[in-house]
């Protein structure tokens, strides 16, 4: 285990909760930071706080409501439909979100004496979000180090994993049922298996089914 501290960018969803369990295995001290950017469902912040409390992790919520004013999108405006038109980014994409979240997480991390930042962004199940790409994370890591003259390391344990492989990682961390029943991935604010219809729920369900089938096949051999 690394004896240093880490800050996890935390939404209370499948990916960031898996990352929180991963970080607790990797680092001696872990803190979670959640951003309030005017999400259409407030349960995300409540779920994140509940999970952090249950896992005994210090939790900070930062006000990023300005982001919702600057970048109207389906995650902050109920009147905007969740959809993706051919050749366009999904309406769930929030311009600048990961750029700002990671920048503010870095400021918090430095104040806490932590240099490790963990985020659940993933390029494999790429939804067209440019700020989930590995090249962006590496670029921002360099920029933050130069901007604050501090040796940050941004960790992306899910970057090259499919959703099925992310479920597998949660299982290996002993957190499969926890992640399955207590996290909030659904764009419509439904905990656990969600609404089953929004893009986030469909991706989550398909990944879980693929992993459970694979796991059953391995056991049957």
Curated annotation (Swiss-Prot):
Database matches in CDD domains: QueC-like
GO molecular function: ATP binding; ligase activity, forming carbon-nitrogen bonds; zinc ion binding
Matching SUPFAM superfamilies: Adenine nucleotide alpha hydrolases-like (SSF52402)
Superkingdom, natural source: Bacteria
Details of cofactor binding: Binds 1 zinc ion per subunit.
Family membership noted in the UniProt record: Belongs to the QueC family.
UniProt subunit comment: Homodimer.
Name of the protein in its database record: 7-cyano-7-deazaguanine synthase
Annotated gene: queC
């Amino acid at each position: 285990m690394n004896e240093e501290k880490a800050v996890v960018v935390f939404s209370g969803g499948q990916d960031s909760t898996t990352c929180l369990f991963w970080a607790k295995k990797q680092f001696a001290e872990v803190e979670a930071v959640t951003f309030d950017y005017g999400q259409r469902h407030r349960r995300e912040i409540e779920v994140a706080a509940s999970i952090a409390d249950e896992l005994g992790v210090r939790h900070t919520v930062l006000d990023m409501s300005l982001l919702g004013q600057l970048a109207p999108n389906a995650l902050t405006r109920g009147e905007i439909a969740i959809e993706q038109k051919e050749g366009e980014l999904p309406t769930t994409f929030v311009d600048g979100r990961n750029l700002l979240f990671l920048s503010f997480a870095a400021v918090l991390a430095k104040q806490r004496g932590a240099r490790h930042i963990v985020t659940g962004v993933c390029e494999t199940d790429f939804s067209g979000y440019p700020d989930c790409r590995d090249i962006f994370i590496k670029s921002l890591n360099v920029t933050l180090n130069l901007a604050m003259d501090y040796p940050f390391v941004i960790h992306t344990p899910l970057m090259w994993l499919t959703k099925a492989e992310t479920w597998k990682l949660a299982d290996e961390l002993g957190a499969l049922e926890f992640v399955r029943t207590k996290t909030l991935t659904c764009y419509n604010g439904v905990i656990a298996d969600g609404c089953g219809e929004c893009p986030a729920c469909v991706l989550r369900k398909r990944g879980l089914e693929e992993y459970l089938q694979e796991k059953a096949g391995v056991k049957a051999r």
